[in-house]
């Protein structure tokens, strides 16, 4: 791997400046609850792939349509409602641009696809997010003329829905070239966090999305763990396998629900947990349609909260797929308009009191056992990531530095297959690989 160039790519010029030019946009309640990390995505394209110049020009046009992607995270000092001067995190919309690296590899793309390893194929996340480009891209050319597009985006700026919208806009800009035109997305992030008057939180968000003060261990069992003791593995569930899971659930069931139910069962079994322990899954829920009133579908930013289906280990491992899916659905249903408004009100009250809120999201190197966290990319429109020569040949697994974190990715061309990428403790990963294709619903390890 050789990095051949590094440059800051400015947005393409527009006829009129966008309305947020130069603004310091405060992070919303949803931004502040999100991971304070860069999130990687890696797309592989077989030859013939578009030129790097075409990909970069498309990126310039996409960033012009999404100007927040060209900004920088910063700390600002402003007066609160009581007239007190307080530090706050902001996104400075300064058009400094996206960082773009060019790289070459003296190898064929097929070798990378066979290994499904994305190491070094996306920019290394900076140690500090303040002042760094919130969007960073690496274009890696292979000996066979294949191309890998690896990017990292900061989660305080992009949630998964926003990342999908941005990436598909970028691909369209590459395809359309000078003819590219796209309506501006909704950039008014503040509409997500309007409190009631007076604010009236009714749920205990301090134990769910936030902690007051510095982050510390919580009921999820998160504890420090050396990243080198975490193994990243990937397994593929074919469309036929997913159909069998759905048949076992019966009735209407989404791919996400049935695969999550299966993965929760098998990972819990692989971990060898005690029967009386409880295990839960942190499930990201897009709140755009669930809020009251709903937010625009094209809102660019964060608008995600989490559901927490929770079961005792003995019950989880003995339950039918139908029952486990029911527990997942019930937890997700609780993230409704009232819950979302309560969350917004809670942050407003905490800010008025001068409380420092720390997100409960896990940090790199932590272990979630006995719990899990799932991030679904099943709604990502990967087929629209066509840069003009066809959709990606593969979406490669990024490094997952948190034990118990899993990502669900649709399999291109499989008509319903799912790739599951998961990070598990070294001594548990092999066990999971041995049992992950078993469809025994009520199998309980002998020690339970």
UniProtKB/Swiss-Prot annotation:
The keyword Nucleotidyltransferase does not apply. This is Tryptamine benzoyltransferase 2. The gene is TBT2. Belongs to the plant acyltransferase family. It is an enzyme of class 2 (transferase). Residues 1-20 are annotated as: Disordered. The active site is at residues 155, 386. Keywords: Acyltransferase, Transferase. InterPro entries: CAT-like_dom_sf, Plant_Fungal_Acyltransferase. Its EC number is 2.3.1.-. Transmembrane segments: none annotated. Gene3D superfamilies: Chloramphenicol acetyltransferase-like domain. One of its GO terms (molecular function) is acyltransferase activity, transferring groups other than amino-acyl groups. Hydroxycinnamoyl transferase that catalyzes the transfer of an acyl from benzoyl-CoA to tryptamine, to produce benzoyl tryptamine. Serotonin and tyramine serve as acyl acceptors in vitro. Specific for benzoyl-CoA as acyl donor. Has no activity with p-coumaroyl-CoA, caffeoyl-CoA, or feruloyl-CoA as acyl donors. PANTHER family: TRICHOTHECENE 3-O-ACETYLTRANSFERASE, TRYPTAMINE BENZOYLTRANSFERASE 2.
């Amino acid at each position: 791997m050789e990095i051949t160039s590094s440059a800051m790519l400015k947005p393409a010029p527009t006829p009129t400046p966008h309305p947020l030019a130069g603004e310091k946009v405060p992070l919303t309640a949803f931004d502040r609850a999100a991971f304070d990390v860069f999130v990687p995505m890696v797309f592989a394209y077989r030859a013939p792939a578009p030129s790097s110049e075409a990909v970069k020009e498309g990126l310039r046009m996409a960033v012009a349509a999404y100007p927040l992607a060209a900004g920088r995270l910063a700390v600002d000092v402003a007066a609160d409602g009581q007239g007190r001067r307080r530090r706050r995190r902001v996104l400075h919309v300064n058009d400094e641009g996206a960082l773009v690296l060019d790289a070459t590899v003296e190898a064929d793309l097929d070798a990378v696809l066979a290994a499904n390893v994305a190491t070094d194929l996306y920019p290394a996340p900076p140690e500090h997010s303040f002042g760094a480009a919130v969007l960073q891209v690496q274009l890696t050319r292979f000996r066979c003329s294949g191309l890998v597009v690896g990017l990292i985006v900061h989660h305080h700026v992009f949630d998964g829905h926003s990342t999908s919208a941005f990436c598909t806009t970028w691909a369209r800009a590459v395809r359309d070239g000078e003819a590219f035109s796209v309506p501006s997305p909704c950039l008014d992030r503040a509409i997500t966090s309007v409190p009631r008057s007076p604010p009236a939180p009714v749920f205990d968000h301090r134990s769910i999305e936030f902690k007051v003060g510095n982050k510390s261990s919580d009921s999820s069992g998160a504890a420090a763990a050396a990243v080198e003791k975490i193994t990243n593995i990937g397994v593929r569930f074919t469309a036929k396998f997913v159909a069998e899971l759905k048949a076992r659930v019966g009735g209407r069931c989404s791919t996400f629900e049935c695969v999550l139910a299966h993965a929760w069962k098998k990972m819990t079994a692989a971990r060898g947990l005690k029967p009386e322990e409880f295990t839960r899954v942190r499930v990201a829920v897009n709140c755009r349609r669930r809020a009251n009133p709903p937010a625009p579908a094209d809102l660019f930013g964060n608008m995600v909260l989490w559901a927490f289906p929770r079961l005792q280990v003995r019950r989880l491992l003995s339950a039918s797929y139908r029952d486990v899916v029911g527990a997942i659905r019930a937890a997700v249903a609780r993230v409704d308009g009232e819950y979302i408004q309560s969350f917004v009100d809670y942050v407003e009250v905490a800010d008025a009191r001068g409380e420092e809120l720390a997100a409960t999201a896990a940090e790199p190197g932590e272990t979630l056992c006995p719990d899990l966290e799932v991030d679904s990319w099943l709604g990502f429109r990967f087929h629209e990531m066509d840069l003009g020569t066809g959709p990606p040949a593969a979406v490669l697994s990024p490094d997952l530095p948190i034990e118990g974190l899993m990502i669900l990715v649709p399999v291109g061309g499989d008509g319903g297959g799912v790739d599951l990428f998961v990070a598990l403790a070294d001594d548990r990963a092999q066990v999971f690989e041995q049992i992950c294709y078993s469809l025994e619903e009520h199998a309980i390890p002998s020690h339970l």
